[in-house]
């Protein structure tokens, strides 16, 4: 006679009733998102209101917070998209009926230096697109700061976004200024910018000799690996519904490698590796063509160190 398999006492009956309705809670007796959100839609506590004592943009559109910086970001998105779409899709040889993925917006010619192109001149559309994209990125970062202030959170999210934003600034603003010409900015366009990235490495002999390139790639790959390990562990342990779930996750990594960095630690470590990788990539780009013209010759100092004498 067949018998039903006995339940493991560590795995309680975790069946639950799903509350009907969009975005509803799955926890019995819990509150829906719609019930919770109003408590956190707090007026004030923004950078704009802290300076001017009033923020006319301190409101929400549905679940989305607007704020002054959200408004600034939307303005940047609208005008930046206009210049980009107009130049790469609506005009030029790569219009809609053709391969607009190959459309490009070239930076100003070298002879313009750090000047500003007049409307209709080469480089004008590039400068306008870069200007409004920079405004949009900065506004989005500051909007994240405002939301963090409202919720009394740390500033880890806007800092991480700001580090990604720094890569754009280095490529399109800081490095061109350091080299004295906007022409050193990268070409805008889906396929052309990939060609620019490929050619950039060859300009300085062998980019694999660039130590900051290696450190940046290591940081990005390591953060991906760390958070993939963390995500797979959480999914595996999610099958266990007991109160000791966190302990089980720590025990797993102690069994695997004798040490567990902990739930908070793995997020912190992935965060540090990710932003560290981008900051290293910033140096990788900034130093190329400015103080360093050839990354292979850059390593000549190693052979001239005094402790190699006589070797």
UniProtKB/Swiss-Prot annotation:
Subcellular location as annotated: Cell membrane
Pfam families (UniProt xref): Photo_RC
Residue sites binding Fe cation per the record: 230, 267
Signal peptide residue numbers: none
Topology with respect to the bilayer: Multi-pass membrane protein
Residues where (7R,8Z)-bacteriochlorophyll b binds: 183, 213
InterPro entries assigned to the protein according to its UniProt record, in alphabetical order: Photo_II_D1/D2_sf (IPR036854), Photo_RC_L (IPR005871), Photo_RC_L/M (IPR000484), Photo_RC_L/M_CS (IPR055265)
UniProt xrefs under PROSITE patterns: REACTION_CENTER (PS00244)
Binding-site residues for a ubiquinone, renumbered to this chain: 253
Keywords, ordered alphabetically: Bacteriochlorophyll, Cell membrane, Chlorophyll, Chromophore, Electron transport, Iron, Magnesium, Membrane, Metal-binding, Photosynthesis, Reaction center, Transmembrane, Transmembrane helix, Transport
Top-rank taxon, per record: Bacteria
Keyword Electron transport on entry: yes
Molecular-function annotations in GO: bacteriochlorophyll binding; electron transporter, transferring electrons within the cyclic electron transport pathway of photosynthesis activity; metal ion binding
GO biological process, alphabetically ordered: photosynthetic electron transport in photosystem II
Transmembrane portions of the chain: 68-90, 123-151, 156-178, 211-238, 262-287
Any one GO CC term of the record: photosystem II
Quaternary structure and partners: Reaction center is composed of four bacteriochlorophylls, two bacteriopheophytins, two ubiquinones, one iron, and two highly hydrophobic polypeptide chains (designated L and M).
Protein family per UniProt: Belongs to the reaction center PufL/M/PsbA/D family.
Function: The reaction center is a membrane-bound complex that mediates the initial photochemical event in the electron transfer process of photosynthesis.
Name of protein: Reaction center protein L chain
Organism of origin: Chloroflexus aurantiacus (strain ATCC 29366 / DSM 635 / J-10-fl)
Origin organism lineage: Bacteria, Bacillati, Chloroflexota, Chloroflexia, Chloroflexales
Annotated gene: pufL
